[in-house]
Amino acid sequence: MMELGHCDTTKSFTGKGDFGETSIITGERMAKSAVRIEAIGSVDELNAFIGLCRSENAHKDLDDIFEKVQHKLFVVGAELAHKSEKREKKIEVKNEDISELEKHLNTHNENLDLLKNFILPHGNKLSAYLHASRTICRRAERRIVALSKMEKLNPELIRYLNRLSSLLFVLARTANNRDGIAEKKWKN
């Protein structure tokens, strides 16, 4: 289990962020607009949206995936909050985590029609929330790529988010498919 270090989680506010700065796990202060903070914030937003997906989900197999992903997103956030030279290597995204996402992708793709067109994000609430989560995941991935141009990061972070966004797309299609909702093709 990851330790929060200096963080006092008993207080709901400190007032230290009132002037546009925040602290990361190491205690280092930085601008809230810093690339690292943007990346951490996008991952946090994604985790919250996956929680929203869980609130609309009635399928145990999907909930198991969502919960594992939520736990892993905390790992992603922990990696981003530590500069790579200061990070414990036992708390990191690994190739096995990506393989697990790929396994779920393959399993859920088997029950879906082959796509030949773009489809509109729509359908039941779960599907709509999953599509929104997918776009947040893509943003988080872009923020992590930007940070990786500034410093060395675990390359599995980018791979994990890339695969996760694909899985969220497939699960959005799965949610509609299970409810018998037809996909709407994009028309130009």
Features from the language model and the residues they span:
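Phosphate/pyrophosphate-binding loop motifs in nucleotide- or prenyl diphosphate-using proteins
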Residues: 1-188
